Amino acid sequence: MARIAPNEDSTMSTAYIIFNSSVAAVVDTEIANGANVTFSTVTVKEEINANRDFNLVNAQNGKISRAKRWGNEASKCEYFGREINPTEFFIK
């Protein structure tokens, strides 16, 4: 599965991963608002499934939001995410 770099896909926009009623990370994604996603700060290399490069470890579930109400909190957020598999984000 080929990945498109974020600057080559005009449909990507800034969104927030919401977890426990707060912003867990800021991400660039084309995933719809309200979609469930999985995120983690730890990954491991996938050794079995050739369609995946990495797997998340100790992952949490959150939701995607682009609501303006999260903007102020997101501006203070120090965590940024990158989609490593469909609906799975590695947080740095």
From Swiss-Prot:
Disulfide feature: none
Entry keyword annotation includes Glycoprotein: no
Keyword line: Host-virus interaction, Inhibition of host innate immune response by virus, Viral immunoevasion
Biological processes annotated in GO: symbiont-mediated suppression of host innate immune response
Modulation of this protein's activity: Inhibited by phage protein Aca2 repressor (AC H9C180) both at the transcription and translatio levels.
Phenotype when changing residue 32 to G: Loss of inhibition of target DNA cleavage by the host Csy complex
CDD domains cross-referenced by the UniProt entry: AcrIF8 (cd22241)
Keyword NAD annotated: no
Subunit structure: Interacts with host rRNA-guided surveillance complex (Csy complex) used to recognize the invading DNA; this interaction prevents DNA hybridization in the Csy complex. Binds to a the Csy spiral backbone.
Biological function: Anti-CRISPR protein that inactivates the type I-F CRISPR-Cas systems of the host by blocking its ability to recognize target DNA. Inhibits therefore the degradation of the viral DNA by the host.
Protein name (record): Anti-CRISPR protein AcrF8
Organism: Pectobacterium phage ZF40
